[in-house]
Swiss-Prot record:
PANTHER family membership: SEPTIN (PTHR18884)
Compartments (UniProt record): Cytoplasm; Cytoplasm, Cytoskeleton; Synapse; Cell projection, Axon
GO cellular component, one term: septin ring
Source organism: Homo sapiens
InterPro entries per the UniProt record, alphabetical: G_SEPTIN_dom, P-loop_NTPase, Septin
Keywords recorded for this protein, A-Z: Acetylation, Cell projection, Coiled coil, Cytoplasm, Cytoplasmic vesicle, Cytoskeleton, GTP-binding, Membrane, Nucleotide-binding, Phosphoprotein, Synapse
Residues given in the record as GTP binding sites: 51-58, 106, 187-195, 241, 256
Subunit structure: Septins polymerize into heterooligomeric protein complexes that form filaments, and can associate with cellular membranes, actin filaments and microtubules. GTPase activity is required for filament formation. Interacts with CDK14. Interacts with SEPTIN5. Interacts with SEPTIN7. Interacts with SEPTIN4. Interacts with VAMP2; the interaction inhibits interaction of VAMP2 with SYP. Interacts with STX1A.
G3 motif: annotated span: 103-106
UniProt function note: Filament-forming cytoskeletal GTPase. May play a role in platelet secretion. Seems to participate in the process of SNARE complex formation in synaptic vesicles.
Lineage: Eukaryota, Metazoa, Chordata, Craniata, Vertebrata
Name of the protein in its database record: Septin-8
Region (Disordered): 1-22, 411-443
Length: 483
């Protein structure tokens, strides 16, 4: 019990004591110092404009800051929503403002609008992530860092006079936890005052019924509580934008000229432009910056740190130190890393085994195919060798026959060349015999006929020539034997 009390008293903070000063110290100049430092450093303010193409976003920005921003003409044929940021350096008196206007180009122009809000949400989260990464650096320089976090979203509502579109409700519901939303009815001069009043009531009722949280001007500061409470009742603001100057009476005012009359931008009886400018720039700009940092960014930061495993205390409400959390997460990540490495190693081993089996199977198939081709090749080679031997045998036989035929032809020609001499000799002998033996004339004529029947033949091809020459040889042999 005593230990518990001691621990309780040791952890309790002492009550501050109020003391009076004996003279002037000087810390009453702290506000002046802060103002001087802020003026030297300058301010940044980032506005996100969401609305359909051609609804008047660029015109309203030019009217709000009383200048002309150079912007590209938007197209109605964008394939998807595209965020286009443009940064400008403005100066009023001795105050510098780095103004960034982010336009949601192509919003609402697609046939399928289910994911039209996604690029906007991703852009806002990306700016939060950039700031978080800068904060987590060991050597951070937030003083020189250009803060691109969105401070306010001006949501432009089409003046239909009936109700909000489903796209508007879904988009604002997705954005209300990430950015300060101020709904605006654009081109309010296109509907009558009675319709505009009913339209405002209808919009606020739909926002409340669907749980959409828009930015409420703060009423906790006594200096602005009254005016902010009045302006909260005028939401959403019905505005008209114009950069043209029209002469009304004896002065030039920004207005829109119509055949039926003139709509003055800064006339509160015509539209809520002045109310919007007062609430957005002159009264609540710093509160919008503070709400972005302390509410929306802190929510994003907390979610990110919880995803990383950081928390303020355990289940017993014991505070965790950053070192303990880091060590715990480090051990957890190392064990997870080892488990993943083991799984990957096992997967690699299994994959290697499967690959080896596949390679062995492929190798076996290739060997079988090679052996088959080898056998086919050997069989073809054997057949070719047999054909070659048969051809050589036929060639040799042909050469032998050719040589024999040539020899026989030469003999036949030689024998034929001896025939005239024999004829003369035989003629002479027959004449002698005829003179002595007259009965031999018939047989002599037969012999001459036999000789005449064995003349050489002319053959056109070699095989018939061989046959004919063979017959000739036989006839010649018979004739020689006969003679």
């Amino acid at each position: 019990m005593a230990a518990t009390d001691l621990e309780r008293f040791s952890n309790a903070e002492p009550e501050p004591r109020s003391l009076s000063l004996g003279g002037h110290v000087g810390f009453d100049s702290l506000p002046d110092q802060l103002v001087s430092k802020s003026v030297t450093q300058g301010f940044s303010f980032n506005i996100l404009c969401v609305g359909e193409t051609g609804i008047g976003k660029s015109t309203l920005m030019n009217t709000l800051f009383n200048t002309t921003f150079e912007t590209e003409e938007a197209s109605h044929h964008e394939a998807c929503v595209r965020l286009r940021p443009q940064t400008y350096d403005l100066q009023e008196s001795n105050v510098q403002l780095k103004l960034t206007i982010v336009d949601a180009v192509g919003f609402g122009d697609q046939i399928n609008k289910d994911e039209s809000y996604r690029p906007i949400v991703d852009y806002i989260d990306a700016q939060f992530e950039n700031y978080l990464q800068e904060e987590l650096k060991i050597r951070r320089s937030l003083f020189d860092y250009h803060d691109t976090r969105i401070h306010v979203c001006l949501y432009f509502i089409t003046p239909t006079g009936h109700s909000l579109k489903s796209l508007d409700l879904v988009t604002m519901k997705k954005l209300d936890s990430k950015v300060n939303i101020i709904p605006i009815i654009a081109k309010a001069d296109t509907i009558s005052k009675s319709e505009l009043h009913k339209f405002k009531i209808k919009i606020m009722g739909e926002l409340v019924s669907n749980g959409v949280q828009i930015y409420q001007f703060p009423t906790d500061d006594e200096a602005v509580a009254e005016i902010n409470a009045v302006m909260n009742a005028h939401l959403p603001f019905a505005v008209v934008g114009s950069t043209e100057e029209v002469k009304v009476g004896n002065k030039l005012v920004r207005a829109r000229q119509y055949p039926w009359g003139v709509v003055q931008v800064e006339n509160e009886n015509h539209c809520d432009f002045v109310k919007l400018r007062e609430m957005l720039i002159r009264v609540n700009m710093e509160d919008l910056r503070e709400q972005t940092h302390s509410r929306h960014y802190e929510l994003y930061r907390r979610c990110k740190l919880e995803e990383m495993g950081f928390q303020d205390s355990d289940g017993d409400s014991q505070p965790f130190s950053l070192q303990e959390t880091y060590e715990a997460k480090r051990k957890e990540f190392l064990s997870e890393l080892q488990r993943k490495e083991e799984e990957m190693r096992q997967m690699f081993v299994n994959k290697v085994k499967e690959t080896e089996l596949e390679l062995k199977e492929k190798e076996r198939e290739l060997h079988e195919k090679f052996e088959h081709l080898k056998r086919v090749h050997q069989e073809e080679k054997r057949k070719v060798e047999e054909k070659r031997r048969e051809l050589e045998e036929e060639t040799n036989a042909f050469n032998r026959r050719k040589a024999a035929v040539e020899a026989l032809q030469s003999q036949a020609l030689h024998a034929t060349s001896q025939q005239p001499l024999r004829k003369d000799k035989d003629k002479k002998n027959r004449s002698d015999i005829g003179a002595h033996q007259p009965g031999m004339s018939l047989s002599s004529s037969k012999v001459m006929m036999t000789k005449a029947s064995v003349e050489p033949l002319n053959c056109s091809s070699w095989w018939p020539a061989i046959q004919c020459c063979s017959c000739l040889v036989r006839d010649a042999t018979w004739r020689e034997g006969f003679l």
